[in-house]
Amino acid sequence: MKRGFSSGDLSSEVDDVDPNSLPPAARPIQDQPTKPPVAGGPPNMPPPPAPGQPAGAAPELSLSFGAGKTPATAAPAPPRGVSAPTSPAKSRESLLQRVQSLTGAARDQGASILGAAVQSATQRAPAFSKDKYFTLLVLDDQNTDWSKYFRGRRLHGDFDIRVEQAEFRDITVVSSADTGPVVTMAAYRSGTRVARSFRPDFVLIRQPPRDGSSDYRSTILGLKYGGVPSINSLHSIYQFQDKPWVFSHLLQLQRRLGRDGFPLIEQTFFPNPRDLFQFTKFPSVLKAGHCHGGVATARLENQSALQDAAGLVSGAGNDSHCYCTIEPYIDAKFSVHIQKIGNNYKAFMRKSITGNWKTNQGSAMLEQITLTEKYKSWVDEISELFGGMEVCGLSVVVAKDGREYIISACDSTFALIGDTQEEDRRQIADLVSGRMQNVCRPSMAQTGPGKLPSRSSVSSRAESPTDEGVAPTPPLPAGPRPAPMGGPPPIPERTSPAVGSIGRLSSRSSISEVPEEPSSSGPSTVGGVRRDSQTSQSSTISSSVSRAGQRPPQTQNSVVEDAEDTMKNLRKTFAGIFGDMXEIANKKRGRTASETSSGSGPGSVPSSAGPGSGFSSSFLGKQFSFAGKGEGVISTQPTQRPSEEPPAIPTTASSAVRPESSVSVSDSRNTDTLTERAGAGYQPVTNYEQQERVNPFDKEPSKSGSAASIHTSSSSSISSSSISSRINRNGNAIQSPPPPAGPPPPPPTNVTAVGSNANSSSGYRNSFSSSLSKDKTSYGNYGSTTSVETITRMDTNTTNIGATATEAGEASGVTAITNISNSDGIVAPTTGTITTSVTTNDWRSAIGMRSASVYSAPAAVTTVLPGDTSGYDSNSIASQGEGLNNPSDLPSYTRPSYSRSESNASKHSDLDVIFGDSKTTPASYGNGKYTRAAGSISDADMIFGGPPSNYKTDRFGASKSMSMTSGGVGSGNGSGSGLGGYKIYDSIQNAAFSDFSDSGSMSSIGSHTKRWSASKEEDDELDLK
């Protein structure tokens, strides 16, 4: 198609160019100079097309190029970007003049239409509240406008999110222990640099604080000093400011997961660049300092290139701060970037198409690939570092042979890539909004009589998001942050008692989310203060659901009020009219908002709160919903037992306004009502869940020395991961004896009775199976209320087995009948037989199974090993005659630590072997923590095969003491007593070596003779990591 121009100098500009073949954004604009536009929009001047509508199908603005649509007087203009070959400057200038002169009226009409649309949208949208908002500080460059991702989001129903975006170089932070941090940000207004100050309630960090020569870690320190919560946590952000430090933590993951489970690239660290000359493996990659985006990274082909690079690095800066790392060069096929944003995962494959060995530089092909379970597990492990990270990433290089190498990890400052950047930013905004909903809470000072809600943790300023002036509020001590009349401290609403990032902070109860009436009662106000000061474990979803279910009329009224009120004075004047309609209606009925939601008076439980009653989330100032018998708890805690909660809630909550002990949290002491059990026997933990921690940087399970605080509301809460002792630490030759040469022989049949406590001497044997059926239901004679792991019994192979039944009451080696009392004092008769066989009695030639979790193979104790135990009296005929070394009594311990305590009275416990006492001392009985004692050999010798002194130094390091807890065990009460026996449990655990001491210790069965000593000689804590 050829078109002619009315202007002669442009007649040859658009030859062979079809405007309809161009994309909509590049289609040319046609001028109409001889026909002025008519006001009101004639057919040749309709409104502009809707966004995304093709230009050919759009209503005409006298600018269309469709055939038959151009008026006779219209002169087509050339397309943009196509210039005449003879005079490009002239044709471009004339084109701009024609376009500017032609589109003036169309621009005016479009502006009027756009203004009307904006005005209508503004009328429908809620107005920004100048007093009720939280300030979000976003540290990122100016390429991304984060304010649009938070526009329209509200916290607690009627609080806006005000976004302050800046780079690290543009802000300074001054933090005070009393008033919190004050951020001063430089802004440019009309070419003039103006500084304004504000207090941030939350921080989103998307820019690396340290990159090359720029180092803004002091800003992170100031924000941390002020206790500002953030994503990611300021703790993790600071930990990521040295790449070797992060890589050292990746090495710890590799040691735990294995090289195949976590294929980390081999890397060598040099704290000083002068030491680089020692490296001899090439080709390699040198990385100097802490840089991003492939900066300060070089590929070295030989020793000469290494010398040149080392010289450059040495002369570039201070030697003490210029560390280097060298890793082997991988001839990569492509690289993979794995990112995690909350619960959203993505994986991208990036392959260079320009031959650059750095795939993040030059031109590269980027493709989103399927996230494998392996990639997901890797990035999940990364997210658990440094107290947990919501946003993190991982870089993997895939070699041409298909092998994968993890080269680096990144935090929330990684660059978003691919076509899903908008989606990723919205997901980050969702994370920030959800966290701010939990940690940003208005002060209780705004709920007092005659006061309207105002910002609590943010300084009150008179400027709007679009104000022109600058608020020069100096130190900002006069803001509403300090609450009067003994309110909460200045900044507690932002942080937990221990940290400021991921602590357990409550999302306000309904009594504090809306302003109270001036006539609200005093007890209700006090209860509201108490409830608001408590912390909650609810998530964003549970708090939102609970809040929406509590007061839908209040939320609607607050939205309507914010949409209609545009001036602060009007809000003050009409607060009583357009306030909380639900609160007014409730007060007409003689109830307050808290009474309506909880079904009772302020802070108390109604008399009708029976087993079927339910309590909403505003009852205790927590986002909990007690529905029925504790089965509707919206919490991260396990559900309480149905038989215990109905009496527990009225009992603890009847103390009016301070019912903090009625709900079990990991940092509060529980009452006995919630933690008592009908039987003190072993309760298997089937619904154990990780409790939310006050300290977000502590990823270990909750640990405490108090018996009342180590139990959750459901069951015991000591996790198995807290038992962190390591057997075989230092590679002693005694640790690995050869496998047994044959089955262990049984004790001799010529058994003589031993004068000892019949109950205690037979309790140990009765706790195991009387046959070789590998029965797992009757071999545990240990009870513990803190049991998480189990000990699996595995019988050894024997020959010539013959079972012998005996009469009850005998205290001989083949007697296995006694009365063992359980935890409730009920005497349960237990009958059984002891398996005996006639073979040689030298059990040291081949013995039992050692720990399967540590040694995975049978072990044997021979007389030629240094651990010769022939001198111990447990090898005697009497001790073997008692059946103590019977083949059916040799269990296999599948725990990472040796954690068994014995109950037989004829010999001492394992403590003498573990703690290294080989002498014979007078035995005694007692309660409490048992430390080192003396006596004869026990099963520890048989299993591990070493002398007693080695168990103290080799097996458990420098451990000197041991704590033991036995549930359902009575105190020792003399010889012949039947009240102190052990109960038989399905899954057993008694004393365990861990990095802390269990409390609530109880004594084992009583015996005056040949028991371990209860003397507290060395009461040190175990350190077995």
Swiss-Prot record:
Got a GO cellular component term for this one? synaptic vesicle membrane
Q: Species name for this entry?
A: Drosophila melanogaster (Fruit fly)
Pfam family membership, one = Synapsin
The GO annotation for biological process reads: associative learning; behavioral response to ethanol; male courtship behavior; memory; olfactory learning; optomotor response; response to heat; synapse organization
Q: What else is known?
A: Readthrough of the terminator UGA may occur between the codons for 581-Met and 583-Glu.
Q: Which InterPro entries match?
A: ATP_grasp_subdomain_1 (IPR013815), PreATP-grasp_dom_sf (IPR016185), Synapsin (IPR001359), Synapsin_ATP-bd_dom (IPR020898), Synapsin_pre-ATP-grasp_dom (IPR020897)
* Compositionally skewed regions (Polar residues) per UniProt: 651-673, 726-735, 750-759, 872-904
According to UniProt, the name of this protein is Synapsin
